């Protein structure tokens, strides 16, 4: 099992990121705890120097399995489903701007809250139409570079759009792109799925990336989820990618990262 953990290259408001800020120090810590990968949360690719990122990551013999994009929503409120066409266009262009960096690292680009929330006065159907249109454009732009997008089903308290694997598989069919799949997250699945294991089986080969956090969004092992069953089911689908920790820095980032990997290494 290949394990990674989320690291924001800059300060961020999003709570479920264990490491933020001092990039070089945090990469060294992550490697020291035994992780093989670091999932980079990047609000805007223009804010980072790809050569410097790669140098630090290679120095510590890590890889980058995925790029997170959620801060574009959290910090700037960019989204694919905003009623303002200028904001929708800015969101699409921002996501497309991740393609060169993703190609460089052979990383999946994650689509979380960049999908947005249906605004007042707009129907759910219109939001879905905007979402599908945006995903089709982004997927088409990424395909020539071998870059894949993974949309993350999120719980009902964060968005009204795409909560379950069933929702996600329907969206995949409507988007119609081979390089578009899903990121499954155990925290959200625990809220929305009748059975985490059955949902993983249903998603199968369209699982492009996988996040772990326990039921309380702490590190795996701090809540009540059965990770032995979950991970066994995941690998039975043929999944060979990274399992990436996206959890709150509780009781603190270092303790959570260390305890999380110690727990997951049992399986």
Language-model segments: residues:
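Flexible loop residues that form catalytic
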Residues: 43, 114, 154, 215, ...
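Hydrophobic faces of well-ordered beta-strands that scaffold small-molecule active sites
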Residues: 3-7, 38-40, 64-69, 109-111, ...
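Generic structural signal for well-ordered alpha-helices
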Residues: 24-28, 50-54, 95-99, 132-139, ...
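N-terminal pre-domain/capping segments
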Residues: 1-97, 103, 177, 205, ...
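Gly/Pro-rich active-site loop or hairpin
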Residues: 10-20, 79-86, 122, 158-162, ...
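Conserved, mostly hydrophobic/aromatic
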Residues: 30, 38, 57, 91, ...
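Active-site acidic/histidine proton-transfer and metal-coordination neighborhood
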Residues: 22, 78-181
């Amino acid at each position: 099992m290949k394990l990674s953990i989320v690291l924001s290259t800059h300060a961020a408001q999003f709570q479920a990121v264990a490491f933020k800020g001092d990039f070089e120090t945090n990469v060294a810590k992550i490697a020291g705890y035994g992780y093989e990968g670091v999932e980079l949360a990047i609000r805007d690719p223009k804010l980072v120097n790809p050569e410097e990122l790669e140098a630090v990551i290679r120095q510590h013999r890590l890889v980058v399995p995925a790029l997170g994009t959620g801060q574009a929503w959290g910090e700037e409120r960019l989204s694919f489903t905003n009623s303002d066409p200028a904001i929708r266009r800015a969101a699409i262009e921002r996501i497309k701007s991740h393609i060169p960096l993703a190609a460089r690292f052979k990383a999946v680009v994650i689509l979380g809250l960049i999908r947005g929330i249906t605004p007042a006065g707009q129907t759910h159907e219109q939001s879905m139409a905007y979402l599908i249109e945006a995903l089709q454009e982004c997927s088409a732009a990424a395909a020539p570079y071998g870059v894949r997008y993974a949309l993350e089903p999120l719980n009902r308290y964060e968005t009204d759009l795409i909560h379950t694997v069933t929702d996600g598989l329907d969206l995949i069919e409507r988007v119609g792109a081979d390089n578009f799949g899903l990121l499954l997250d155990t925290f959200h699945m625990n809220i929305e799925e009748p059975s985490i294991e059955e949902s993983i089986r249903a998603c199968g080969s369209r699982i492009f990336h996988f996040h772990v956090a326990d039921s309380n969004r702490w590190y795996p092992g701090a809540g009540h989820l059965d990770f032995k069953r979950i991970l066994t089911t995941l690998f039975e689908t043929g999944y060979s990618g990274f399992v990436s920790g996206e959890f709150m820095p509780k009781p603190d980032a270092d303790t959570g990262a260390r305890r999380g990997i110690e727990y997951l290494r049992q399986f």
